[in-house]
Amino acid sequence: KKSLYYAVLAKAGLPDAMETISKGFDSGSAVDKDNAFYALLNIKGMAAADKLAEIAAADDAAYAAKALDVYVQRIAASDKTPENKTLLLSDVLDIAGSNKALSAADARKIETKALQGLENNKTFQGMMLAGKYLGNADADVSQAAVMAVIRTALAHKEFYGPAVTELLKKAVELNKDKDSNYQREEVQKHLASLPATGGFVSMFNGKDLTGWKGLVENPIARAKMKPAELAKKQAAADETMRKDWVVNNGLMEYVGHGFD
């Protein structure tokens, strides 16, 4: 039976297992599809991660939520660096927030788990990403974001500056944890211990590309240019930059095709 065949392939971890199981999911009968899917869920490590992410982002409600949930589990259990896990969890949040095949309840549950993952990894990028979910309409999502911001900041004294202070103050106000009073005191002491100036200053306002400019050749070449030539090339570079970069859901997204 193919159900047993897929299960054996998944357990054995053979090099061609993913290709065979993926083919069964993509083009097999309804029964084959189900069997292949459950085999994918049982492949340990990150071997099936890309396929699970693909299924999670697709419009098949029968599989999307479970695929995304297991994908989050695989990220958490992997040996990837905290920075790489943060990037993958960012993709999870994008899928959870945009895939209409997910029910609202499933999307919120997965967002909560992804934010908890950001808390566990405690990266600067993860803290800033979690900040976008502070005050979310779903209480669990908002609280997960609160804890990700607070615990990441408290673990890293090198994370400071106006943007970090603003996030921490907002997180403290929204905190519904049973230990919120104690955590408020921790945050206040933490903020008082940080340098009053310097630190992280956001180069991106989260709305548009104001202040961003395209790159004109290299510093040596620019230094040799006359003002009129530099201005002309800068205008062309700025136009290219605006074509290559867009703002999507508060994040800068590259849509270009690389350098010529």
Language-model segments: which ranges?
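Alpha-solenoid HEAT/Armadillo-like helical repeat scaffolds in large eukaryotic proteins
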Residues: 20-28, 51-59, 91-102, 129-137, ...
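Charge-dense, low-complexity polyampholytic segments
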Residues: 158-173, 226
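Short regulatory "switch" loops immediately downstream of catalytic or recognition motifs
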Residues: 73-78, 92-100, 154, 173, ...
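Hydrophobic beta-strand residues in large extracellular and virion-surface proteins
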Residues: 21, 36, 52, 114, ...
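Carbohydrate-interacting regions of secretory-pathway proteins
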Residues: 173, 182-260
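Structural detector for internal amphipathic alpha-helices that build alpha-solenoid repeat scaffolds
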Residues: 2-15, 20-23, 33-45, 54, ...
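Core helices of alpha-solenoid repeat scaffolds
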Residues: 18, 49, 85-89, 127, ...
